[in-house]
Amino acid sequence: MVLKASVNSFRKIFGWGVLSFFCSQIAYGVSVDTKSYDPFCGVGVKVAGKTLVIGWDTPEGSTELTLNLSGQGALVRSVAVASGKGKVIEVVRDINPVTVLTVGQRDLNKRSGWTIFFDRTSRKPSESGPLTLKLKSAIVRSVGKRCMVDLGELHGESFSGKLRFTIYAGCDLIHLQSVVQTNQDARALLYHAGLTCDPTGKTVSWIGLDDKVHQVSADMQPAEPEKVRHRTIALETEAGSLAVFPPPHRYFYPLDEAYNLGFTWRGNDFMNHVSGFGIGIRQALEGDRRWVPWSNAPPGTKQELGVFWLPSTARGQQLFDRVKAYTHGDRFVEVPGHKTFTSHYHIEHTTRLLESREKQQGSVADEVVNTSRREGQDWRYSLRQPPKDWIQSSFDDQKWKKGKGGFGKKGTPGLRLGTDWNTQDIWLRRTFKLKETPRDKLKLSLLYDEDTEVYLNGVLAASVKGFSKTYREVPINPEALKTLKKGDNLLAVHCWNDGGGQAIDVGLVRPMKISRPREMPTPEFVSVFKKAGVDIVHLAEFHNRLGRDRRNPDKALPLLKLLHDECIRLSDKDFLLLPGEEPNVHLGGHWISFFPRPVMWVLNRAKDKPFVEMHPKYGRVYHVGSPADVLKLMEREGGLMWAAHPRIKSSTGFPDLYREEPFFKSDRYLGGAWKAMPADLSKPRLGERVLDLLDDTANWGAKKYIVGEVDIFQVDRTTEFYAHANINYLRLDHIPRFEDGWAPVLKALQDGAFFISTGEVLMPRFTIGGKQSGQTLKLVASRQAQLEVELSWTFPMSFAEVITGDGKEVYRKRIDLTETGAFGKQTLKKTLDLRGKTWVRLEAWDVAANGIISQPVWLE
């Protein structure tokens, strides 16, 4: 939707003409600079006494925002809304925008720069404080069909800049941004934003995780986080309401888990930095307690700390429906001729099902030596490395500290915290008595995060790596089991942790035979995907403690069989769940495997093993032990592979380091996976790391593509799935049946017949010279071709960009879209000069950094 200015409507709203407003005016001491303001932008502006009044038409009718430029009292004098042609009604009055900045340290050495995920930012020193506005200037300017009011100066936590209000003609949003920068290097940040006001006569509302609207009186109770749907909290008055919410994806830095951490707040004295009552959005400083990198803030970059206000005369569900429209209700909507595909999930469903079946088939735990899951048990512990004989009963641990189990960090899954532990290593000892020598085979009951060694009476009982979210029953080494005796015995434990969640607790259990009915429930993640409009899900299982079992045929094949069985059980005519893995061997870095049918393969090849053999139970089984084996497997089975999180995490340096390898040059190697990682709030696009990779590989002469990945573990009805997700729209006319194989899905990927979207911006049609993405265009003599792209969107658009390359350089041509409003669609047609170019692709981004990414069209 391209908007046209309606000066008469603003005269109706304000009772004055906007065309008489030129150059600058004085609002009682504060100069208002309007040299760059054009009243035909569709937003009316005037100075009235000590105030700046902004008015514009909206789908509801019209809105009027009055800013107090006196420097005294609340900055926002009022927000008023008119329904239809009715009278403007003041919805809220005397409110102050607030932004609290949390600044931490970025490790620029570990990965040689800003492209880093494995950074323990949340565990390093940080400081939080409000950004304070000292009103010294007001600049009003317009760009296209939008008007910006910049107020200076804004200062706090070594950052400085301005507070910006952006109004989009024809749109009901008020976009607030603290645009700030720092001169200090190696900084990472989080921000928290909202508003403060007098709570008298007001209520606060939100949609809870039960999907119901909740409403409470606004009062002066201490501020607390609220877990909500759609990342939105609202202030309600008798006249209407004001919803507050963040950019739906940009606000959320990358994490391994999509936990709902309570991203809104309400109450008094927020973070001990905001005086009085308020509501707003927030980030939890500790994140998911794993790797918590926050957002990059390089020196000199203008960080846009944004939040949206949506004022309305509506309240409750009606208000939230208006907010939800901007993300289609957190749903990836249908695009004709396309099916939605999402990839890279470590849901561990197979693992949990396997554990559940083990219990159904035989055991519950009778604790012989109690764990601390119900009541804290007494331990001796040391945070310094002890002498070598610390595992022996004769060792004197009286100088060690005393503590209750479990040990770790608050919030670590499965942990009942007894004693805080936040160093890298911990050593524990505990004496226990047995009334008699055990006749049954006992097991360890073990909760751990991360690598753990357990000793019984000085003999190694078990060693585990990684982490568990629940107590695991771990077999005891027979030699250690033999040491158990009547009377005193010793448990000695060493646990090592490298960041994120942190936990250790140990006991001994006796398996007891039981009889339980076998249940096959549908896991919650299936309904979450379906509700979000996802048609096809590609898993990346066994990226946990079972990953090493994939190298052992005796363990790997039953795991794969169970995975395949569950995928077919949970698939139906409208939803396809597909097996996949994220191996970390053979190629370099981490990579994703994808086959067009169930394939049995083992991630190891012993010296005496053939590449392929017929198994009496599982049929054809492949054994892969080298890059050549992997490539041969992919060629035989028509599979695809690509780099997981390329150039970051455990794929740092890849695929660049193996770009000359045969498997990379093969058509079986798709390319890389796209995710908005790392985060940088100064960037107008998300995920530049992988967009640059796409351009680089195209210039290498390799026809590769990038597929959107989500790369999270838990997905259930409590998670904030949509904020962390993206989607691939594949050019498919139907969802394949699992039983028939899903070769059309792989073909769409291999052909580049898809685009990536965050969900708010869509691209139903895209051609250059009549060719779609992944196809090859033979240029005519003029070397010109016609771009035709159909776009639709919810938030107002910012720009589209045509990206081309010639085998050496990358070229960008921006198409300005600031004439657009909210909830529009447009077909762009443009003649492109493609002389000397070998490929071309397109991106389009909105004002909240939501967008679409095409795959390349190849040029000859």
Where are these regions (language model features)?
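Beta-strand-rich ligand-recognition modules
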Residues: 447, 453-508, 822-826
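Acidic, contiguous internal or C-terminal segments within carbohydrate-active enzymes
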Residues: 63-69, 137-203
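Aromatic-lined ligand-binding clefts that engage carbohydrates, nucleic acids, or primary amines
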Residues: 194, 400, 424, 432-458, ...
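Extended carbohydrate-recognition surfaces in non-catalytic/accessory domains of CAZymes
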Residues: 363-440, 470-474, 495-497, 502-505, ...
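C-terminal functional module detector
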Residues: 83-84, 89-129, 138, 280, ...
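A metal-dependent hydrolase metal-coordination microenvironment
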Residues: 350-363, 513-638, 643-644, 650-654, ...
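Beta-strand-rich recognition/accessory modules
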Residues: 232-337
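Acidic-aromatic substrate-binding/catalytic surfaces of carbohydrate-active enzymes
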Residues: 33, 48-136, 146, 377-396, ...
